[in-house]
């Protein structure tokens, strides 16, 4: 009975360690993707605000209302 429990433990622990390492790696990859998405959104916001700001200056310059 003891040898059966010992063999089950020898199979169980490496499996759980391997699983936790895979989950850590997956979490790290997701964090990298999230950072890349956040950077792209920040760039898009910067471009959009720059375009809108330039548009306002053009409208003010052409209409003379500002």
From Swiss-Prot:
Main subcellular localisation: secreted
One Pfam family this sequence matches: FSAP_sig_propep
Tissue: Expressed by the skin glands.
Subcellular location: Secreted
Propeptide: 23-45
Coiled-coil ranges (or none): none
SS bond list: 60-66
InterPro entries from the UniProt entry: Frog_antimicrobial_propeptide, Nigrocin
Leader sequence residues: 1-22
GO biological process, one term: defense response to Gram-positive bacterium
Keyword Signal listed: yes
A GO cellular component entry from the record: extracellular region
Keywords: Amphibian defense peptide, Antibiotic, Antimicrobial, Cleavage on pair of basic residues, Disulfide bond, Secreted, Signal
Its job: Antimicrobial peptide active at least against the Gram-positive bacterium S.aureus but with otherwise unclear activity spectrum. Lacks hemolytic activity against rabbit or human erythrocytes.
Entry similarity comment: Belongs to the frog skin active peptide (FSAP) family. Brevinin subfamily.
Name of the protein this chain belongs to: Nigrocin-2GRa
